[in-house]
């Protein structure tokens, strides 16, 4: 194969440098210092009629935030109001330094999220449908871009936009009785909340096409077999087996360095979208952001003194 021209190689290297710089520019110590406190209005005590319950767990679970979808009468379908509440919650959480892990679950037994609210959509003019789907995509993208680990606890039905919501999370766990699928082709449309892009990245292109083309619905065991979820649990009497597993995972994350967790997520996410050489450069740049942190020094000191580290996210 003919060698590339020097100018082309230079342009490629320049492009990689710019990409790495763009990925890591916001990771300096000053960025962590700017983290703000949670916005008012989100606490562990939320009115039961609210469609989204935001709970900041306390004591040994401090740092874990649970977003509980609570729209039983609509099977947790994504309505305009629920999207507005999700957007507001995510906007508040993304800049909160105290947040370490976010769990998305359902407060409604047997349902995670049934997708877009088709009853609401049926009342829309055709000119409203596009912007509504764009809003779903935007909110799901915001969830995917949260800087801390996110876990979807799927204890029930997750169809269409509901599965797309779960696909935006870093880790997915489900009960064996849960049902998951991108079923939009049954309605003569396609997944519009990122499903055509995130499902192939999760399970491979060929299988993703098969599932989307057929609108097939998988149970928890089948989803685990194809790599759609990380863990499958037998459902318990309370109907929250997946949530309990998600909580166990979140507790495993809590002792780790907060800055390191955020930077690791960024390095993985950005690196997966580029070639290996560029990905390694992103890793190097991200690693460099941890060197000057107080947490790194605390980790070394704790190791020397044979005690658990006390990380502050600095």
From Swiss-Prot:
InterPro entries: ClpP/crotonase-like_dom_sf, Enoyl-CoA_hyd/isom_CS, Enoyl-CoA_hydra/iso, Enoyl-CoA_hydra_C. The keyword Lyase applies. GO terms for molecular function: enoyl-CoA hydratase activity; itaconyl-CoA hydratase activity; methylglutaconyl-CoA hydratase activity; mRNA 3'-UTR binding; RNA binding. It catalyses: (3S)-3-hydroxy-3-methylglutaryl-CoA = 3-methyl-(2E)-glutaconyl-CoA + H2O; (3S)-citramalyl-CoA = itaconyl-CoA + H2O; 3-hydroxyisovaleryl-CoA = 3-methylbut-2-enoyl-CoA + H2O; (S)-3-hydroxyglutaryl-CoA = (2E)-glutaconyl-CoA + H2O. Its main location: mitochondrion. One of its GO terms (cellular component) is mitochondrion. SUPFAM superfamilies: ClpP/crotonase. Residues 1-42 form a transit peptide. Residues 80-94 are annotated as: RNA-binding. Its EC number is 4.2.1.18, 4.2.1.56. The modification N6-acetyllysine is found at residues 75, 88, 119, 179, 186. The keyword Acetylation applies. The modification N6-succinyllysine is found at residues 75, 84, 88, 119, 123, 135, 179, 186, 304. Disulfide bonds: none annotated. Pathway: Amino-acid degradation; L-leucine degradation; (S)-3-hydroxy-3-methylglutaryl-CoA from 3-isovaleryl-CoA: step 3/3. Belongs to the enoyl-CoA hydratase/isomerase family. Catalyzes the fifth step in the leucine degradation pathway, the reversible hydration of 3-methylglutaconyl-CoA (3-MG-CoA) to 3-hydroxy-3-methylglutaryl-CoA (HMG-CoA). Can catalyze the reverse reaction but at a much lower rate in vitro. HMG-CoA is then quickly degraded by another enzyme (such as HMG-CoA lyase) to give acetyl-CoA and acetoacetate. PANTHER family: ENOYL-COA HYDRATASE-RELATED (PTHR11941), METHYLGLUTACONYL-COA HYDRATASE, MITOCHONDRIAL (PTHR11941:SF12). This is Methylglutaconyl-CoA hydratase, mitochondrial. The gene is Auh.
């Amino acid at each position: 194969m003919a060698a590339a021209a020097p100018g082309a190689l230079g342009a490629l290297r320049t492009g990689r440098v710019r990409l790495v710089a763009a990925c890591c520019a916001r990771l300096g110590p000053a960025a962590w210092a700017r983290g703000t406190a949670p916005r008012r209005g989100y606490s562990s005590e939320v009115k039961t009629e609210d469609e989204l319950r935001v709970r900041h767990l306390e004591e040994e679970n401090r740092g874990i935030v649970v977003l509980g979808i609570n729209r039983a009468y609509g099977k947790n379908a994504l309505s305009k109001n629920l999207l507005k509440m999700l957007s507001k919650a995510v906007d508040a959480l993304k800049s909160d330094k105290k947040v370490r892990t976010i769990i998305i679950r359902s407060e409604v037994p047997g349902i995670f999220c049934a997708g877009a609210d088709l009853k609401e959509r049926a009342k829309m003019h055709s000119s409203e449908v596009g912007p509504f789907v764009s809003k779903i995509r935007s909110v799901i993208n915001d969830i995917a871009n949260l800087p801390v680990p996110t876990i979807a606890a799927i204890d029930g039905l997750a169809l269409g936009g509901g599965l797309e919501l779960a696909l935006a999370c870093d880790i997915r766990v489900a009960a064996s009785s849960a049902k998951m699928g991108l079923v939009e082709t049954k309605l003569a449309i396609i997944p519009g909340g990122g499903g055509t892009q995130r499902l192939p990245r999760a399970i491979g292109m060929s299988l993703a096409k098969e599932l989307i083309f057929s609108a097939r619905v998988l149970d928890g065991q089948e989803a685990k077999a194809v790599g759609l979820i990380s863990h499958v649990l037998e459902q318990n009497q309370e109907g929250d087996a997946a949530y309990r597993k998600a909580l166990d995972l979140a507790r495993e994350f809590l002792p780790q360095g907060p800055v390191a967790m955020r930077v690791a997520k960024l390095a993985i996410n950005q690196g997966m979208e580029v070639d290996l050489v560029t990905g390694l450069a992103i890793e190097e740049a991200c690693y460099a952001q941890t060197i000057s942190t107080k947490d790194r020094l605390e980790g070394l000191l704790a190791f020397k003194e044979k005690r658990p580290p006390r990380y502050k996210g600095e």
